[in-house]
Curated annotation (Swiss-Prot):
Keyword Transmembrane helix included in the entry's annotation: no
Biological process according to GO: cytoplasmic translation
Listed PANTHER family: LARGE RIBOSOMAL SUBUNIT PROTEIN EL15, RIBOSOMAL PROTEIN L15
The keyword Protein biosynthesis is assigned to this record: no
Gene designation: rpl15e
UniProt keyword terms in alphabetical order: Ribonucleoprotein, Ribosomal protein
UniProt family annotation: Belongs to the eukaryotic ribosomal protein eL15 family.
Cellular component annotations (GO), alphabetically ordered: cytosolic large ribosomal subunit
Protein name: Large ribosomal subunit protein eL15
One GO MF term attached to the UniProt entry: structural constituent of ribosome
Amino acid sequence: MVASAYSFMASTWASEEWKKTVIRQRLVEWRNQNTVTRIEKPTRLDRARALGYKAKQGIIVARVKVEKGGMDKQRPNSGRRPKRMGVYGFSPAKSLQFIAEEKAARKFPGLEVLGSYYVAEDGKYKYYEVILVDPHNPVIMSDPQFNWLKNPANRGRVFRGLTSAGRRTRGLLKSRGLKGTIHYKIARKKKEREQKKRHEASKYYRLAKYDRIPGK
């Protein structure tokens, strides 16, 4: 079976030599750009076409950079231990890809997010490219592949977690095993409760080590 052009694109993008030469040079330019930058064509054409991208009117691509790391929480003025200030160690309950889609949707309020994909990352940012569609463009409204976006039920779909990244964050996408499903969250919470019981600071753990509970 002859390999397609898109398979060659995917293998080239995954090669370490490509990342060390081409991607590293592009990251220097991308870091100095705005948070949301509209681009003429997708950087990873194979991923864009897999998500439904077409080079036609009403469809644009935007590159979004999202800062890596935890949340930038405000430091409280009232006194407390540094451990209890709630500043460090907090991460958002959404993936960075989901956040990138929301940033692009706010930049282009008249468009709907079709999908997004990972591009690259450096020490400070992760870069994603988001595909946006104008649901009221005549070309889009006459295309059966995209005219479902004009339905009012799909308005603001990215802010309701209806994109692929949003559904993955909500635990609704299927995967091998429990991970990636709503049942994985239940199993994870159950495991966390058991670990909390066995912690040395837990009253349950301290009393469990006695043959007889004190005071009884």
